[in-house]
């Protein structure tokens, strides 16, 4: 402080100007450091500093911002047209429609299962050994398998009966036809078919002449005299 007081007024002003110039130079260098890092403000091969890029004109900036806003408006208009005028109402109705659709699907599935259970109960009622007290309620798969085996067994039984009937019909066709003798009513006396004056021949001849029945069927022809 004593040294400052000893300085004259002109020297003090010169010293203050020197300090101000040094501070301004430091501030200018600090401001130019980012430009130097980007390549601006550094001398080129000829010693000239490259020119900094010219700032964009206000008209061009306004035009570009207008184009961007126009594109955004077009995109918004397209989205609005795609959604349609009732998009908000559709959004409010969608949860209720989904709930009603889910309830209808559940009700339809419940009815289908009830119908299936009723059909299986009716099938168990007509299958033997499926509704016995000693047998617990069969499952769906077991009921279907038992019904399949029962149907196959019935089909085999029908085939056996058809073969048996065909065999019996074939045996009757090969056998000689036999005429049965007329049956006399109960309580009436048998009338002798031979006249009193007719010559009596052997029993086989008489049987054949009267009724046409072979003598092999007459028990009197085989009796011993």
Swiss-Prot record:
Pfam families, per the entry: HLH
Keyword Phosphoprotein in annotation: no
One term of GO molecular function: DNA-binding transcription factor activity, RNA polymerase II-specific
Record region (Disordered): 35-104
The entry's keywords: DNA-binding, Nucleus, Transcription, Transcription regulation
Residue ranges of domain bHLH in the record: 100-154
Gene3D superfamilies per UniProt: Helix-loop-helix DNA-binding domain
Signal peptide: none
GO CC field: chromatin; nucleus
Annotated localization: Nucleus
Domain of life: Eukaryota
Record GO biological process: axon development; positive regulation of transcription by RNA polymerase II; sensory organ development
Function field: May function as transcriptional repressor. May modulate the expression of genes required for the differentiation and/or maintenance of pancreatic and neuronal cell types. May be important for rod bipolar cell maturation.
PANTHER family (UniProt xref): BASIC HELIX-LOOP-HELIX PROTEIN NEUROGENIN-RELATED, CLASS E BASIC HELIX-LOOP-HELIX PROTEIN 23
Name the UniProt record assigns to this protein: Class E basic helix-loop-helix protein 23
Record organism: Homo sapiens
